[in-house]
Amino acid sequence: MSQKSNFFQKRYSPTATRRYYGKIETNFIQPNLADIQIKSYQKFLDHDLEKLIASYFPIKSPNDRYTINFRGLHRTEPERDEAQSRAQSKTYEVGIYADLELVDNDKGTVKKARKSKKNIASNTNGVFLASMPLITHDGVFIINGIEKFVISQITRSPGIYMLTKSQLKLSNSRKRVQEGYVCEVLPANGSVMLIYISNKKKIEDAFVQILLRDAVREGAKIFPITTLLKAFGLNNREILKIFKNNEFIKRSLEAEIYNAKDFLSNVDPEIKNLLKEFRDGKTDLRRKGIASDQKLRSLVNEYVTLEKQYNALKQTSPNDSSLTALELEMENKMDSVITERAAKHIVNELSISLRDIENTEECHEVSFHALLCARFFRNKRYNLSNAGRYKVSRKLRLTERIYQKTLACDLFLKDGKLLLKKGTLLLKEEIDKIKQAAKNNEISFVNKMQLTTDGKAVDLAKESLFYETIDVYITNDNLSVSVPVIGIHNENDLNKAMTLSDFIASISYVINLPYGIGKYDDIDHLGNKRVKLINELITAKLESGFTRMERFLKEKLTIADGVNRGQQINEEGQVIEQGEKKELTIKSLINSKPIQIVIKDFFNTHQLTQFLDHQNPLSELSNKRRISAMGPGGISREDPNLDIRDVHYSQYGRICPIETPEGMNIGLIMSLASFAKIDENGFLMAPYRKIKAGVITDEVEYLTALREDEHIIAEISSLVNISNDNKILDKEIIGRYRSMQGLYDPLKIDYIDVAPHQVVSIGSSLIPFLENDDSARALMGTNMQRQAYPLIKPYAPAVGTGQEHKIASDSGLTMSSPCSGVVSYVDNSKIIITSDSSKKETVNLVKFERSNQNTCYNHKPIVEIGQRVNKDEIIVDGPAVNKSELALGQNVLVAFTTWNGYNYEDAIVISERLVKEDILTSLTINEYVAQCLSTKNGDEQITRDIPNVSDANKRYLDENGIIMVGAEVKEGDVLVGKVSPKGQVEVSPEEKLFKAIFPESVQNVRDSSLKVSHGGDGIVSAVKRFSIANGDELNDGVIEMIKVYVVQKRKIQIGDKLAGRHGNKGVISKVVPIEDMPHLEDGTPVDILLNPLGVPSRMNIGQIFETHLGYAAHKLAVRSLISSCFDQNKAKEFAIEINQPQARVERLIKGLKNQINDRNIKSEKEALEKLDNSDISLVLKEIGMSFDDLIYKIATPIFQGVNFLDLQDVMQEAGLDPQKNQGKFKLIDGRSGMPFERPISLGIMYMMKLNHMVDDKIHARAVGPYSKITQQPLGGKSQNGGQRFGEMEVWALEAYGAAYNLQELLTIKSDDVQGRNRAYAAIVKGAAFPEPGIPESFKLLTKELQGLALSVSFIYDDNTQQDSNNVSILQSDGEQDEFFNDFEFDTEGY
């Protein structure tokens, strides 16, 4: 790593070279920007899917007669490739087959699935489960021919959190909030638990409680924490021993009823009745209660038996030594009774289903204790996941809490040596000693406790409970009061389920918080959030499908098993009689429909599955790197919590602080930072270089947010002085520790950033001079780049950041060379490369395809025959790509000045040159689909013989009735002629006879042709025809499908939206002829006039820097061209600098030399003075170039690029004296020929045409559909609706007294049905307009008033009244207006 001043030529590809002004040069290799989801889905297909299926097997029948085993997974080859899937509107997918075997344990036979018609061709064994979509090399899914993408979700990570306030979500959007010292246990699968000490009581009276949500989510129940510990199998003595008689724990024991010493005296009615029953000699254990109760009855009976033995022995031998043993045995038995009774109490309070334990295979016995343990200590019911276990282990380890505390006991190693003595202040060095000793398993602070419960359930079946404990003093000043700090043992690290050790360590953390031991968690910290990639999202969805399949399978096995010995099932799963028994097979048992439905729902209706944003390469790549906090289990967009949406310091280098939507989704939809990665647990990581003893090494480490919090990290900037051997020379440099920034000694710094722009996303990193823009404008600029419409002649920005090539390369819209070799053939549709091994590789190009956003997807080769190419080198430009660099717009000459008020309020004035020369012209491709269906009345037909359509309207249809490619179509033209059979009608005998004689002349069909929609004028670019007769797969009921693609060439026009990269946007208000535009003194007309008032208040000064630097880059190219005419040695270097082929540049120099010779110019200085833009323009046109090609490309990376001094140097080099003109130039008004009063800021700015074009928005309606209820016109362009004339518009007309206009608008132009029909008739007949009638909306109002029990009637001028119910608006009663004699009206339609 080294620092550079000024610039050097940086070559990104053979066609892309830029002047690089970055101050920091690094050899860090940027990761591929699009491969995160590709690798994730590949992992799912290769590992996760098989692991998921294997977790459900083996499945056994209730009586163990049958067992189904899973032996592996197989995939077929895809039936069609990516191109075919897109063309045929099919899914790019493979078949998934499971290798299952059915074992009959009675007969000892093993059966496997035989090949079916579906898998016989693929030579795949097994049961077909589902068709699984494949991810393409671009990282997208093709679902029904449409490219889709699954964005990642960021959620709170499972784990244990210490908070001052938390909540449990209940049903019906209710919440249960708890405040105090709260430990929130958040599992990946299972219910949230809150272990807390309430702040509603004095700390001297408070005790530890637990809040649990019931099984039906209707409410939440509170228990003393010791009640739960006892239900898990601990007794009073063990609890007090673990927590060393802590006062909070003592008060918890006092608050509950399950204490051995007073349990019998305060016994609950159930135990009291059982004791009475067994003491009276009634020993029928099964007489009462369900199976789960039998354990409790058995324990009470055993206790009574011991009690009787004790009493009998005490009477006969009061001094017998065995009495003590009996007392201990009775005490242990009472502990077991308490455990079972406490467990029953919790189970009943939480409404936990007893079927879970009575039907489970996970427990060795049926008891409430076993049920409770199975619920909290089993993976399937309570799962922390790998990420959750990592978080829990990290949170509950001792060393996290004892920093800067004083040791209250001696710490010994296992060999008896003293590690740390009592009274030691635990700082980083001492804690590192403890960590190292624990890592080597040398320390002896691990406690082992024997459990007294006789239950044999789940984790508690182990004989011992392991936990770690260290005593520390509460304060370092008062060394008299100590508390135990309890942590979990390392053995738990691989266990995804909760353990009793976890509970105990969590309780210890809570009771230590009031003493200031431990720290609260920040739930907005990225260390407490994780990203769910597609493999996790689809696995979670598939679990529900496999669970349903497992349930169906078990039901069928129950029928097939000895449970119903005389019955078996057929392949549909139905019971068959004894006489028609069939052999049981795998296929008759497996029902895979739930899995197929789940996969289909996931890729079609899941909240995080979206249409891929194909607007341009940047929008596609940004879409793939987007993460959402919404989705299943996520945050609602209506949630007003600003803390969730705000920028957090832990997002540095992981999530972009700039790129996010502006609306209600702000802060909920985010983008990954440029270099961010995701680890195996889903935590975001940022790259940093390791610093050792003040020297920056080449070692790059990716750190999670939690690991980063442990280190001091420096920011890399041009202000840091670094020697040639990468040693930091400054005594102090800026660094950060967590959220604090300060000056640090380089020897104390652990890491340094790899690059300044690692903090922002790829979209934000494209904005030059980002550091000079206001954050709100930077956000707008980032978002608007994604809306840029691909142009037919795109140009890469003159002032870039150096990221343009990387984004174009990783976007997937360009094409790279598959090998190293020489180009042997190039045309419009393919490129052939002869590799170094003489093998020919063909690269097929995409031509004028339609994208999801109706943009034109077209490839253009950028190599020539005989050119040498390297592997993975870009050889084909895609849409919005120019010479392997991202090109979202055009470099245009702009001036900041007003112009007759036409650029008021951000409006933009443009030159007609942009229209005539197609500078900002784009292509839009619309798809029209016609389907020929099979109906109950007969099949539809594609034909040219369309009833009631003139030959003029069918002139472009071929003999089959399909539009010809290249035809220019207008609105309403027929694209595909199609007729549909009418419904069955009664036919007279004469018509039957006529039909029999002339069957073809009388057709009972109607016109259902596909026509060009409103505003869809264009040229037909392609027609695709699919038919069942040709073997194409179509949807049910579809005989034939025809797709017609119509291309629109959209020139820039008034109403279109333009924007720069700095959040500067506006709508075109005027297109001015070139001769009327302001121009420079040499005659160069300005392309765009921007309002200067749009700069200072928006605080995006970056656009001014870009303007000056861009103009200097253009002038530099002109000066270099002239210089090359006098020094031939500079020609090659000049060709590289302007990214043009050497041969073309030589022709350009030759042409300009002729101009110089003709004008007898002798020196370079004279040429610079006498040659103007018009002279150079003539030469450029002769060789097919324009001024847009004659410009230097500059890279100014954000936070380290061109500064004010560099800009002055560049302008000076270009002959623009910054001290003299300050970037302002004399402009002359093209209309008057007079110069403007003052010099005007002028330069070259990169402007983009956005996807907000007037052609898509402007709309007019003459006739159209009406609402059924109000009879008012519908709204919106899509429904051919009208323009709403609202309340404020009515006020405006009222203010001017325009009564008649207002009356027309509110009656005959809206919902006066009879009046508008009369008006139409009057217009046709040329008669006078009739009086308006009563609007339909008024009638609707009367009905609503009547619904409020109010009588409404009409009172006329002659004081006659009429009930509103008797007034027919649609037609007057009893009379027909004379206007309607010759007309028929459809009052419901047009």
From Swiss-Prot:
The keyword Nucleotidyltransferase applies. Keywords: DNA-directed RNA polymerase, Nucleotidyltransferase, Transcription, Transferase. One of its GO terms (biological process) is DNA-templated transcription. One of its GO terms (cellular component) is DNA-directed RNA polymerase complex. SUPFAM superfamilies: beta and beta-prime subunits of DNA dependent RNA-polymerase. It is an enzyme of class 2 (transferase). Gene3D superfamilies: 2.40.50.100, 2.40.50.150, 3.90.1100.10, DNA-directed RNA polymerase, beta subunit, external 1 domain (2.30.150.10), DNA-directed RNA polymerase, subunit 2, domain 6 (2.40.270.10), RNA polymerase alpha subunit dimerisation domain (3.90.1800.10), RNA polymerase Rpb2, domain 2 (3.90.1110.10). PROSITE patterns: RNA_POL_BETA. GO terms for molecular function: DNA binding; DNA-directed RNA polymerase activity; ribonucleoside binding. Its EC number is 2.7.7.6. Disulfide bonds: none annotated. The keyword Transferase applies. Transmembrane segments: none annotated. It catalyses: RNA(n) + a ribonucleoside 5'-triphosphate = RNA(n+1) + diphosphate. Pfam families: RNA_pol_Rpb2_1, RNA_pol_Rpb2_2, RNA_pol_Rpb2_3, RNA_pol_Rpb2_45, RNA_pol_Rpb2_6, RNA_pol_Rpb2_7. InterPro entries: DNA-dir_RNA_pol_bsu_ext_1_sf (IPR042107), DNA-dir_RNA_pol_bsu_external_1 (IPR019462), DNA-dir_RNA_pol_su2 (IPR015712), DNA-dir_RNAP_su2_dom (IPR007120), DNA-dir_RNAP_su2_hyb_sf (IPR037033), RNA_pol_bsu_bac (IPR010243), RNA_pol_bsu_CS (IPR007121), RNA_pol_bsu_protrusion (IPR007644). Belongs to the RNA polymerase beta chain family. NCBIfam families: PRK00405.1, rpoB. The RNAP catalytic core consists of 2 alpha, 1 beta, 1 beta' and 1 omega subunit. When a sigma factor is associated with the core the holoenzyme is formed, which can initiate transcription. DNA-dependent RNA polymerase catalyzes the transcription of DNA into RNA using the four ribonucleoside triphosphates as substrates. This is DNA-directed RNA polymerase subunit beta.
